[in-house]
């Protein structure tokens, strides 16, 4: 059984390869440091069970973010105060051997679930992501993310869209 877990020492970070060296290096060298410093949290998808070193199928990281509402669409901005909070999906990657098997969607749905946990405690207007390129942008758009007017590679998924998506997946 597959499980989403908070990144821990028991996870095999060194064996992870998604094909993108910056993402590999983040997981291997930076993710746990960011967690210790309170910068972000990284979650991994692993096969369940009690093994010594759990291979990582994929991961995502989340951090808090704040932005000016004017960076959103005019329709969204008019309903909000000047400064708004959300959650940033900092990174999302799938190990090469698991790519094109729906793992990215599994990770994204898990990130949405984590967003809702935070939303229920502290609020937030949605999930933000900086797509690394046009291909990544199109991937996120499949799930309802929309580009911000100020930067087409910065995308936003409103809380109501997340709630609807999770209701359909349950």
Where do the language-model regions lie?
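Non-catalytic substrate-recognition and accessory regions of acyl/acetyltransferase enzymes
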Residues: 1-101, 105-170
């Amino acid at each position: 059984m597959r499980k989403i877990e908070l990144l821990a020492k028991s996870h095999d970070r060194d064996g992870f390869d998604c094909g993108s060296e910056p993402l590999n290096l983040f997981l291997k060298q930076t993710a746990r440091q960011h967690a210790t410093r309170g910068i972000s949290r990284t979650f991994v998808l692993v096969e369940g069970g009690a093994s010594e070193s759990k291979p990582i199928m994929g991961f995502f990281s989340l951090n808090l973010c704040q932005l000016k509402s004017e960076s959103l669409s005019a329709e969204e901005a008019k309903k909000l105060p000047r400064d708004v909070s959300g959650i940033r999906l900092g990174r999302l990657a799938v190990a090469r051997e698991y790519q094109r098997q729906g793992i990215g969607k599994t990770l994204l749905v898990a990130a949405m679930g984590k967003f809702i946990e935070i939303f229920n405690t502290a609020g937030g207007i949605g999930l933000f992501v900086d797509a690394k390129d046009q291909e990544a942008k199109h991937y996120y758009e499949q799930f309802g993310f929309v580009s911000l007017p100020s930067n087409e590679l910065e995308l936003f998924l409103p809380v109501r869209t997340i709630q609807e998506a999770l209701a359909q997946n349950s």
